[in-house]
């Protein structure tokens, strides 16, 4: 295999990257953690479009299921000490270099989120690093994890009509890491914090609730579940 490294763009404080399927072709999104743009690239590294020029503070981006013109992203998470105005936004393509950006939900200190699908429904899992602070580097107010059923159509949401969130778990200091894990064919969220590693399992149906399993009880920054040794069990 021959690999060639090349510079495709200059982006100060480049932080977040996400795959994006558009017109049947693989693309990828790149955004920054500070006040900087978000760009859409072809799989070959050609810069195709500017999605936004500001405000930045992007920790996470994910395409909306079933949409080739829409994704969700965090905005205004600049640092643990400067993220009280953090939120999740909806980016919808209206034309070339023409993207509409609307607020889906204000979620102070939101660091990670994920969209999980189960039995034809999509769920938003929202992970907030902490729940407040009174001074710099204040970690006395632990983070929380929220969830919401994600409607098929997001056109009705904006800053004055936000998606309601339901608290799933609090007391999560340094609620930092998130990854998606297929558990026997079910998409689940793996969330990490000082209290350990927790697996969030979406409802099986309308009558069921979320399941939360603690997988580990020591402080963890980030985690990925994988069957490394081939024994059929994740490590």
What are the roles of these predicted feature ranges?
Residues 1-235:
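Beta-propeller-forming repeat regions
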